[in-house]
């Protein structure tokens, strides 16, 4: 469950380290985002010579949450932290070329197959 002001880790090599959610996209009064949802973020911490810099406003897809995601069989997949992958504002394709850490099977839609293929592990 990601809401406005939530700090997230970045699970790719775009150059950002920490980001903050500034808007949950999809509906005018939508409050929370889960795994697979697109959010608007601003970069709070970045490494030198990265593809993005501090203060940039981008879109991101949530790939891991502490709240977890419930499967139809009743199991819940939870993680130790909240993480996202940065997306290009226009094409909504990943900015980074590598993904760090596992991602969930819920990302297997037409839009995020690139993230699934880059991820080292799909749970």
From Swiss-Prot:
CDD domains: Ribosomal_uL14
Gene3D superfamilies reported for this sequence: Ribosomal protein L14
Subunit structure: Part of the 50S ribosomal subunit. Forms a cluster with proteins L3 and L19. In the 70S ribosome, L14 and L19 interact and together make contacts with the 16S rRNA in bridges B5 and B8.
rRNA-binding in keyword set: yes
InterPro entries (alphabetical): Ribosomal_uL14 (IPR000218), Ribosomal_uL14_bac-type (IPR005745), Ribosomal_uL14_CS (IPR019972), Ribosomal_uL14_sf (IPR036853)
Keyword Ribosomal protein in annotation: yes
GO molecular function: large ribosomal subunit rRNA binding; structural constituent of ribosome
Protein name: Large ribosomal subunit protein uL14
TM helices/strands, residue ranges: none
Listed SMART domains: Ribosomal_L14
Database matches in PANTHER family: 50S/60S RIBOSOMAL PROTEIN L14/L23, LARGE RIBOSOMAL SUBUNIT PROTEIN UL14M
Keywords assigned by UniProt, alphabetized: Ribonucleoprotein, Ribosomal protein, RNA-binding, rRNA-binding
Function summary: Binds to 23S rRNA. Forms part of two intersubunit bridges in the 70S ribosome.
Database matches in SUPFAM superfamilies: Ribosomal protein L14
Any one biological process term the GO annotation gives: translation
GO CC terms of this entry: cytosolic large ribosomal subunit
Assigned protein family: Belongs to the universal ribosomal protein uL14 family.
């Amino acid at each position: 469950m990601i809401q406005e002001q939530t700090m997230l880790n970045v699970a790719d090599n775009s150059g950002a380290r920490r980001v903050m959610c500034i808007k949950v996209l999809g509906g005018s009064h939508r409050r929370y985002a889960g795994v697979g949802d697109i959010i608007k973020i601003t970069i709070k911490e970045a490494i030198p010579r990265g593809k993005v810099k501090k203060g940039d406003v981008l879109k991101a897809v949530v790939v891991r949450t502490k709240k977890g995601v419930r499967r139809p069989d009743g199991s819940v997949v939870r993680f130790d932290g909240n993480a996202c992958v940065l997306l290009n504002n226009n094409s909504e394709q990943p900015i980074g070329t590598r993904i760090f850490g596992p991602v969930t099977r819920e990302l297997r839609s037409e839009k995020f197959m690139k993230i699934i293929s880059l991820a080292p592990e799909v749970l």
